[in-house]
UniProtKB/Swiss-Prot annotation:
It comes from the Bacteria. GO terms for biological process: trans-translation. Keywords: Cytoplasm, RNA-binding. It comes from Maridesulfovibrio salexigens (strain ATCC 14822 / DSM 2638 / NCIMB 8403 / VKM B-1763). This is SsrA-binding protein. Disulfide bonds: none annotated. One of its GO terms (molecular function) is RNA binding. Required for rescue of stalled ribosomes mediated by trans-translation. Binds to transfer-messenger RNA (tmRNA), required for stable association of tmRNA with ribosomes. tmRNA and SmpB together mimic tRNA shape, replacing the anticodon stem-loop with SmpB. tmRNA is encoded by the ssrA gene; the 2 termini fold to resemble tRNA(Ala) and it encodes a 'tag peptide', a short internal open reading frame. During trans-translation Ala-aminoacylated tmRNA acts like a tRNA, entering the A-site of stalled ribosomes, displacing the stalled mRNA. It is found in: Cytoplasm. SUPFAM superfamilies: Small protein B (SmpB) (SSF74982).
Length: 155
């Protein structure tokens, strides 16, 4: 019998600013508690990561600052676009993240939303902030790598 190919999870949205502004130390996968109209909006890709971050309250992790646009074809039951959404993580993962954020001055940022086996998952990253100088160095390093790759391809 032939083996089935594993499909890579299809991305809904990426947080491009996070890769530019933060250096990732560790990444995790978390589930989200969503309402039906939020899922339908996410299937259409109507989400914005602009000011998203993870907040810890009473032993729970919450996704704050993510805008999921209202679903057009919903009736009278519409979700609130900017409400905080609970993350589904194990208690030990939450404790570990919370302690590292408090001790080392790191932050937890959302990286991407994607479908995994019919469920919507959020990739979060424990990250260290970059300053402007580090960002410029990173851009220079990428430009140099791109130029050398281009020259090697032409050689």
């Amino acid at each position: 019998m032939a083996k089935k190919k594993k499909k890579s999870p299809s991305s809904i949205a990426l947080n491009k600013q996070a890769r530019r502004n933060y250096e990732f130390v560790e990444t995790l996968e978390a589930g989200l508690v969503l309402k039906g109209t939020e899922v339908k909006s996410l299937r259409q890709g109507l989400v914005s990561f602009m000011d998203g971050y993870i907040n810890f309250k009473e032993g729970e992790a919450w996704l704050v600052g993510i805008h999921i646009a209202p679903y057009d074809h919903a009736g009278y039951t519409q979700h609130e676009p900017d409400r905080p959404r609970k993350l589904l993580l194990h208690a030990r993962e939450i404790e570990k993240l919370q302690s590292r954020v408090e001790q080392k001055g790191l932050t937890v940022v959302p990286v991407r939303l994607y479908f995994s086996r019919g469920k919507i998952k959020l990739e979060i990253a424990l990250a260290k902030g970059r300053n402007v100088h580090n960002r410029k160095e990173e851009l220079k390093r990428r430009d140099i790598a791109r130029d050398t790759a281009r020259q090697l391809a032409n050689y």
